[in-house]
Structures are given as C-alpha cells and as structure tokens.
Design a protein with these regions (language model features):
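N-terminal glycine-rich, Lys/His-bearing helix-loop that initiates the first secondary-structure elements
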Residues: 1
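Conserved PLP-enzyme active-site core in the AAT-like
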Residues: 5-8, 13, 17, 26-27, ...
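Metal-dependent phosphohydrolase cores
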Residues: 23
C-alpha cells in the first residue's frame, strides 16, 4: 500500500451514498471533518481565492465562523487580532446582506433584489453566495428549502442575463437535514422558479448522526 488510500472502495461507496441521500451529483463524507465549522471551513477554503467576494445573504453567520472569515466578535468587517490565516487574511472579501426587516412574515426572507443588485454591481468578483439555513443564535426563522432554491434561481438568472460565471451558491445545511422531503441541492419535479444549490455542507454530529455521532461532516453538490 502507498498509504494514500487510492482505490479505497469503501470510502468511494460511502461518498456515493452521501450524494444519493441528498440527491446530489457528488458527495464527500468523512469522520476527519470534526465539526460543522470545520466542514464549512474546508468548503470555503477550497473554493475561495484572493480577490474573491463571498456574499452572505442571511446576515452574519455563526459566531464560530468569525475566525474563519476574519471578522471580529461583533461581526464588523475588520480583521481581528487573531485573524492570521483567515479568509480575509488571504485576500477574500467578505460581505453580507441582512434578511428583510420582518423575515417571519415574508414569503421570501432573503432580500433578493439587494442580492441581485449586488451581483450586477460586482459581477464575477462575487465568487460565492452563502446561505445559512438555520437561525443559529439570531432571532429569525430557519429558511425553507423552497426559499433557498428560489434565491439560487435568481442568482442563476442574473448571471445568465449578464453573461458571467455564476457564483457558487453554498448552503450551510446544519440542523436542516431531513426536516423536509427534499434538500437544497435537489429540485423536485413541478417546482417553479427554483434552482439547486451548488454546494451544501453540514455536520454528522447533528441531524444525520441522530445525536450519536461524536465527529464527522459532509459536503455534497455538483460534481464540479
């Protein structure tokens, strides 16, 4: 054995199973992804490069992501003292849009017009549109799968109209797994004005592990 795990049929089968469970093109599931934050960080560092804009359209993410993003503990867009190695330190520009003023009654809590306008203004510099499905520690509702996919549709639509590369639409799916009949990366037949998320990521410690898993995470989405 070379030690690289090449040809590990069990691992490959498990990855395919993860993709099948979430109805995605491809999947990656590992116990070496220690937590939800670790899993999200792996996905973010894998996609974002210096000069890219990461646009969160659900406001400030979990507090545990502030060091990954390079924000201070109040969410201000300035580096914190311990931000060395963060996405901001590496040249990634983090921006955020807040949800609509009354997200509990809005049919679509994401401020879609503001999101579309941001993409029109910054074009291909917007490498990622980021959605946190769960409410986290904020006073707002969790997003439904349809609400997320409608936002993904608008991102795809404006990108097509502008003739630019579509931003990666990524969803922090923690706490959202299996609470509906579909997931953000899959659009069921009959759905109107919806598009699948390119990437969803979450922790096995939460819903998928049934409260019994101590570690683990998954990243599923398009094969690209």
């Amino acid at each position: 054995s070379t030690g690289y795990g090449s040809g590990d049929r069990g691992r490959d089968a498990l990855d395919k199973l993860a993709a099948e469970v979430f109805r995605a093109e491809a999947g990656f599931i590992r116990p070496s992804l220690l937590s939800g934050t670790h899993t999200l960080a792996v996905a973010l560092y894998g996609i974002l490069r210096p000069g890219d804009i990461m646009l969160s359209v659900t406001g400030r993410p979990y507090d545990t992501l502030t060091k990954v993003l390079g924000l201070d503990q109040t969410g201000d867009e300035k580096p914190q003292i311990s931000s060395e190695g963060s996405l901001r330190d590496l040249g990634v520009d983090y921006r955020q849009l807040e949800l609509l003023p009354d997200p509990f009654t809005a049919e679509e809590p994401i401020d879609v017009p503001a999101m579309v306008e941001f993409i029109r203004r910054h074009g291909e510099k917007v490498k990622m549109v980021y959605v946190q499905r769960s409410r986290g520690y904020a006073f707002r509702p969790a997003l439904t799968v349809s609400q997320i996919r409608r936002a993904a549709y608008e991102v795809e639509k404006v990108s097509r109209e502008m003739g630019i590369r579509k931003p990666v639409f990524m969803v922090d799916n923690c706490y959202g797994e299996f609470v509906e009949t579909t997931e953000p990366c899959y659009v069921p037949e009959g759905a109107v004005n919806e598009a699948p998320a390119d990437l969803i990521a979450g922790s096995l410690i939460k819903n998928p592990g049934g409260g019994m898993a101590d570690v683990g995470g998954y990243i599923v989405g398009t094969a690209e």
